[in-house]
């Protein structure tokens, strides 16, 4: 009994946490759960922290299968698949995550700004010069590998690259295959955007699952090797790796939040004039330039880092729960499951992982981080997938590079998608 009282879930005592869970169950059964910011935040944060806690307690899950992060994703996905969570709540979570509410934008704004501004300037510039070329070369290698394997197994080069490789590298659902399906539909004589979207979605979903498994495996297998940078892409001095201790200040956290949101809006403004480039990509470029030129005052940098710490600590598990509940559709995945499809998806993930690993050694980067950041991330489903992949491999500090690779490669996929759909069909 004493041990139960001392048990804490994310710093919250077990009796108090049980009260939160009981309230959510009762209000959901009564059909009175508010499908707004209050109700959905309570649901996702409580569910996310609970599933993470359970996952961390399972020995095999904790040691070999990604622990709490992967368990949160799997657990939430199964709750949705078996209709344990009502469908109207799932729909509301979907809107909350990426629709009208933009909860993911809130989270990713904090993540990108905090990770870039909190990084050592020299380290950021040094790593970026080598990482971006590796991500692009890896993408080209992955594209042709999937096409060639497709030819060998009777799936054809065109169908393999256009319906497996391209969607896997497109950057997810919203910013990836939604515009890609529109581009395909416009390029085909009798193209139907909805039908094409349903053909592209399984590759994105399954590719994301394989990317999570791949990132987790790389991190585990090479944990104690010389190839592991422990979250850092390039070899660095102690001074470059040193993270200053920051004392949280309520007013500064508010300032950091406003600055992060303003930079996201600046990305929106640029996206208005260049709609083919995602707002996140513009945001990364802006923050990168500000950091590289030492434009942001130290106290403002610290404010953004504080905001990042608060959001990361309290909302990461909630985001993973939301991804599992609303964004991973096992029915869609099952409908496309053929052995050829599995082989092609595996080819993309394995080849891109190996290519980025060897390119990292050639360019002088840590292979573990590069294989995760350029290989696995380029097969994930965009912002949500990046979070899932990096969380599973305990590399969340790499979010800026992940978004950079994802958005850059995603934009290239959209451009070439419009050209190749007319060329092949």
Swiss-Prot record:
Pfam family, any one: 2HCT
A single GO cellular-component term on record: plasma membrane
Keywords tagged on the record: Antiport, Cell membrane, Membrane, Symport, Transmembrane, Transmembrane helix, Transport
Location in or out of the cell: Cell membrane
UniProt GO MF annotations: antiporter activity; organic anion transmembrane transporter activity; symporter activity
Record-annotated membrane-spanning stretches: 11-31, 35-55, 65-85, 96-116, 134-154, 196-216, 246-266, 269-289, 310-330, 339-359, 401-421
Topology in the lipid bilayer: Multi-pass membrane protein
Recorded catalytic activity of this chain's protein: (S)-lactate(in) + (S)-malate(out) = (S)-lactate(out) + (S)-malate(in); (R)-lactate(in) + (S)-malate(out) = (R)-lactate(out) + (S)-malate(in); glycolate(in) + (S)-malate(out) = glycolate(out) + (S)-malate(in)
Annotated family: Belongs to the 2-hydroxycarboxylate transporter (2-HCT) (TC 2.A.24) family.
Purpose: Secondary transporter involved in malolactic fermentation. Catalyzes the uptake of divalent malate into the cell coupled to the exit of monovalent lactate, a product of malate degradation (precursor/product exchange). The malate/lactate exchange is electrogenic and results in the generation of a membrane potential. Is highly selective for the S-enantiomer of malate. In the absence of lactate, MleP can also catalyze the proton-dependent transport of malate.
Description of its domains: The 46 C-terminal residues contain structural elements that interact with the R groups of the substrates. Interchanging the 46 C-terminal amino acid residues of CitP and MleP alters neither the specificity nor the affinity for the di- and tricarboxylates malate and citrate. In contrast, changes in substrate specificity are observed with monocarboxylates.
Protein name (record): Malate transporter MleP
